Amino acid sequence: MLLLSCKTMYKTLPFSETPIPEAPDYNNNDSWAVLPGQYPEELISITGKSSQSDVDVFFVYPTLLTDKKDSSWNADFNRVDIRKNVLTKSVKFQASSWAKAGNIYVPFYRQSHYKTYVKPYDLEGPASWKIAYQDISKAFAYYLEHYNKGNGIIIAGHSQGSIMAKELIKDFFDDKELQNQLVAAYLPGVRVKKNELGSIQPMYQPEAIGGFVSWNTYKKKKYPKAYEQWYKGGVTTNPITWDKTTKTSRSEHLGTLNSDGKIYDMAIGIEIVDGLIWSTVPRIPKRFLLSFVKSYHFADVNLFWKDIEVNAQLRAKTWLELHKTN
């Protein structure tokens, strides 16, 4: 049986009739997109070579499995195209913003197809999401046992990656001993309510540690169709000032990482409304094309790439001063 919607037309079978891809073995380096000491060229091309740090960054990439003709519910991380997308899209343009703050770890995982967030396919979503989180949870547990060695931890993600990261925070940090090692959690691209993560609370100072930041970016004066359901009421951090400032001009913006690999400063001004960041059209090459785009979800990280890079280093420095002084 094929499940086809008039609007979305995703070719798919019921979850129960679809083969589940092989699980990653995190003892095998091939199950990691990024490990310290063996950064891929895609990452090095943006950040340069890394130096060892007493802070680690555990990054979970967003939904990259989106093809409407792909009938799978979960990604096969061994597929060449999937591995390439992770490196050339998310690692290069997203994970790179945290590279100067710590040692980067990015596990491959059997992420859920985008359709699991679209009606009527979302009815099968929970079964698919469970597989995705099983992988991320196992990857993080493996990281803790074999790599962490008492280092500070930055948890970062985007979109589906932030959904996975939220669950990590609940399971491994909230009221747990590991909470003392949490530098910060960066959770853009998904709604996070103030008390959703228990003792891990929102941060409203640029040097604060031990909490989380989150935001969702949209074109100025525009609202998503599902605003009430997916955005309203979420914590909305100002990712330029990192405080409770609700309007920030272009002059304070440190930089957007564009698809050409260049950073453009003073590119956007923002305004915070309930659950959203409203952004001006970025002043970057080919900006005319962006003037027709309402949702900047795809650029939640890229738009504030340099701002994140600088802030993550500040929070890492603060944590190190408190925990690693001799």
PLM-predicted stretches and their roles:
Residues P62-G150, P285-N302, Q313-T325:
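Active-site catalytic motif of lipid deacylating hydrolases and related acyltransferases
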Residues S137-K149, D171-T318, L322-N326:
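Surface cap/lid and interfacial helix-loop subdomains adjacent to catalytic sites
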Residues D56-V60, Y105-F108, I154-I155, A184-L187, ...:
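Structural recognition of the beta-strand scaffold that forms the well-ordered cores
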Residues S53-V55, K100-I104, K149-G152, Q179-V183:
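Loop/turn elements at helix/coil->beta-strand transitions in domains of secreted/extracellular proteins
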Residues C6-V91:
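Flexible, membrane-associating and regulatory peripheral segments of lipid-active enzymes
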